[in-house]
Regions:
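A short, compositionally biased domain-edge/stem linker segment
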Residues: 1-3
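Ser/Thr-centric signal marking residues that sit
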Residues: 19, 23, 115, 140
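Substrate-recognition "cap/lid" segment bordering the active-site pocket of phosphatases
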Residues: 112, 118-167
């Protein structure tokens, strides 16, 4: 195994959900959390049911399955509000993340975030958790115009911003 020399590190690109922030459980349970806010107990495997659906199809499923007297758009808006509240008020950094980011900052290593999450949620979470001061730039898939699984573009843009070769 090659020894890492700190002077060899020219930049760092981090995903946000599940890497910097302990947010994956929220994504697994957003529908359940929304229904709980409506006073409804979700079925135990709701996340599996919704996983393969678009937001619209998932909202229509919840509308029909739980007898919600809301439009699919209102349900989507409610789920989005649940997500917004989580990022703005509840999400916490993963263990060791603040220390790692402080270390990188101490050595003037640029840090970027490349995420599928919308900028408003990213900024709210990073500011509240105190991590924003360590991040030099945020790149979101919606702003880049393509998802991370479909293209390396978001990583290439982050590397270019830091003046480092993409590797």
């Amino acid at each position: 195994m090659k020894k890492i020399v700190i002077s060899d590190i020219k930049g760092a690109i981090f995903d946000m959900d599940g890497v910097l922030l302990d947010s994956m459980p929220m994504w697994d349970h957003a529908g359940e959390m929304y229904l709980a806010g409506q006073g409804i107990q979700a079925e135990s495997d709701l996340e599996k049911v919704l996983f393969t659906m678009t937001m619209m199809k998932g909202a229509e499923y919840m509308q029909e399955h739980y007898g919600l007297e809301l439009s699919a758009k209102e349900i989507i808006d409610g789920i989005n509000e649940t997500v917004r509240d989580f990022y703005a008020n509840k999400v916490e950094p993963k263990s060791g993340v603040p220390e790692l980011l402080r270390f990188l900052k101490r050595y003037d290593i640029p840090v970027t975030v490349a995420t599928s999450t919308d900028r408003c949620h990213v900024e709210a979470a990073l500011v509240r958790t105190g991590l924003m001061k360590y991040v030099d730039r945020i790149f979101t898939c919606s702003e880049v115009g393509v998802g991370k699984a479909a293209s390396p573009k978001i990583y290439e843009m982050a590397a270019e911003f830091m003046g480092t070769p993409a590797s």
